[in-house]
């Protein structure tokens, strides 16, 4: 694993979840878009090695993907897909398109190139749901790790299990929570209380919830139409994401 205690790095954020279907990827893409719209240079790295979907979220089809550079087919500069002046995507193929065993060293070499040869303010890594060796390497190269969860009991259980394992590798202060699909403030309070009650009782730690998104049909429509809801006219949804982005902007400024 790589030690990232270096100066002048971009803020590297891994976005994880204990289970699939909680909105991790849609939050990643819209957070990146919000940060880029605010004038920051942002890279989205699709770290889902088996079923990547960030290119779907953005509605683009990059000609080259991360696995092309892992195997030496093209260099990294050919793989980084420019969506606008501030927003770039390191997309990937799913495993049924190109078979390739995970070579952690090659993936971490890409990381070294990113922080050495490119000037990004933020790198957002959209990881695969659940636990894997690759995920543990991603969290180790990240300054912050955000766990996305919702009110589904299995989401709460799996999020707790993920936190428990993460604490073996990173400091508690690096772990943040993002709650998705809330119905109202009472729903938010209930989810936040449940996950932190369990964490305090069994791990002796509580974790900061830095943002949330409501359940909204427009979010689901944006996925179907491969459009970002932060590009829509829905001011309320955009405000939720702007509040989340502001957390990272402030963190980047003062850390």
Model-based region annotation:
Residues 1-12, 250-255:
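Acidic-aromatic/histidine active-site loop/patch
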Residues 224-255:
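NTP-binding/hydrolysis catalytic cores, primarily Walker-type P-loop NTPases
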Residues 49-50, 85, 94-97, 130, ...:
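Conserved nucleotide-binding/hydrolysis micro-motifs of P-loop NTPases
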Residues 59-64, 165-166, 193-196, 228-230:
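Short, hinge-like loop/turn segments at secondary-structure boundaries
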Residues 44-121, 223-225:
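P-loop/Walker-type NTP enzyme "switch/lid" segment
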Residues 201-229:
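Beta-strand-loop-alpha "switch" segments that mediate conformational coupling across diverse proteins
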Residues 5-47:
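Walker A/P-loop phosphate-binding motif and the immediately C-terminal alpha-helix
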Residues 116, 127-211:
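Conserved catalytic-core segment of NTP-binding enzymes
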């Amino acid at each position: 694993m790589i030690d990232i205690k270096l100066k002048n790095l971009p803020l590297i954020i891994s976005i994880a979840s204990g289970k699939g279907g909680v909105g991790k990827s849609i939050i990643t893409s819209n957070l990146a878009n919000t940060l880029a719209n605010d004038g920051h240079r942002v890279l989205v790295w699709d770290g889902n090695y088996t079923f990547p979907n960030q290119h779907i979220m953005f509605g683009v089809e990059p000609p080259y993907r991360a696995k092309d550079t892992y195997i030496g087919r093209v260099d990294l500069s050919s793989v980084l897909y420019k969506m606008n002046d501030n927003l770039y995507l390191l997309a990937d193929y799913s495993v049924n398109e190109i078979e390739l065993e995970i070579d952690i060293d090659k993936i971490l070499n890409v990381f070294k190139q990113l922080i050495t040869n490119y000037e990004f303010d933020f790198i957002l890594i959209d990881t695969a749901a659940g636990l894997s060796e690759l995920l543990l390497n991603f969290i180790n190269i990240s300054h912050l790790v955000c766990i996305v969860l919702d009110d589904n009991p299995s989401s709460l259980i799996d999020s707790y299990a993920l936190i428990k394992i993460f604490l073996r590798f990173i400091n508690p202060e690096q772990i943040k929570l993002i709650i998705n699909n809330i119905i109202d403030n009472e729903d938010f309070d209930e989810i936040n209380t449940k996950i932190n009650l369990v964490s305090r009782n069994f791990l002796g730690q509580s974790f900061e919830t830095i943002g949330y998104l409501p359940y909204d049909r427009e979010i689901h429509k944006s996925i179907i139409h491969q459009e970002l809801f932060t590009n829509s006219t829905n001011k309320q949804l955009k405000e939720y994401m702007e509040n989340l982005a502001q957390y990272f902007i402030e963190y980047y400024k003062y850390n």
